[in-house]
Amino acid sequence: MTVLHSVDFFPSGKAPVAIEPRLPQAAFPEHHHDFHEIVIVEHGTGIHVFNGQPYTISGGTVCFVRDHDRHLYEHTDNLCLTNVLWRSPDAFQFLAGLDQLLPQEQDGYYPSHWRVNQSVLQQVRQLVGLMEHAGDGMDAPAVANREILFMQLLVLLRRSSLMEGATNNDAKLNQLMAWLEDHFAEEVCWEAVAEQFSLSLRTLHRQLKQHTGLTPQRYLNRLRLIKARHLLRHSDHSVTEIAYRCGFGDSNHFSTLFRREFNWSPRDIRQGRDAIIQ
């Protein structure tokens, strides 16, 4: 597995934060690093496999990667990222208690992926721009200024995450997409889902298409197929059982959609034939 080292990314041996834009981010094999990372998805779509679990990501997704996590990107479509790298909680001179603003693992579950709305994403861009142009002076005021900007970024993300319960349409769509991640295998009635999240059906269709480039049903199918591919690689369940577990009522239809999406059959994935080009 590829290991990325801080010496190759941080501007100096003492700098606690670095900015790495990926415009766009191509598919990238599994890796980990000796630093922490906040991944901010500007726009586009892709699959982020995080510690073996696949997540669909799009504009407004924010992922918090720790120094012991492993991840990769695949199936990317104009995926543009800004990576905010930071060494460790004890690398800062003026900041303490950062863990209170970051996602925390509880009972083995780490809420690594958050979502923010487009207006917040614009504020994030402005803050990151200030961080990029803050200079590399090592006198106390310069260092403090850079650390303050990083703290402002964490506060903005924390306040704007799903946990803060914003009520505009962007936030409602983010909540809906998070709900689909957990309920993808269920039968989904879009009218009922729209009502559940206080969106009109028309707004749901329009906003999901703007965020992901996909219609709601196409987005749900892709989500199901991504989860199915993960099970094909990492479980002993039969293809038919996996199809049903992932919300498909007919295994033949599942196989047709799977091949159309990934250019491999479920059996090919089960046998590892795609690994040659990973």
UniProtKB/Swiss-Prot annotation:
Record-marked site positions (Interaction with sigma-70): 241, 250
Q: Which GO terms describe its biological process?
A: positive regulation of DNA-templated transcription; rhamnose metabolic process
- DNA-binding region boundaries: 191-212, 239-262
Q: Which residues form the HTH araC/xylS-type domain?
A: 174-272
* Paired cysteines (S-S): none
Q: Name where it mostly resides.
A: cytoplasm
Note one Pfam family from the annotation.
Answer: HTH_18
| Subunit structure, as described in the record | Binds DNA as a dimer.
Q: What is this protein called?
A: HTH-type transcriptional activator RhaS
Q: Which organism is it from?
A: Salmonella paratyphi A (strain AKU_12601)
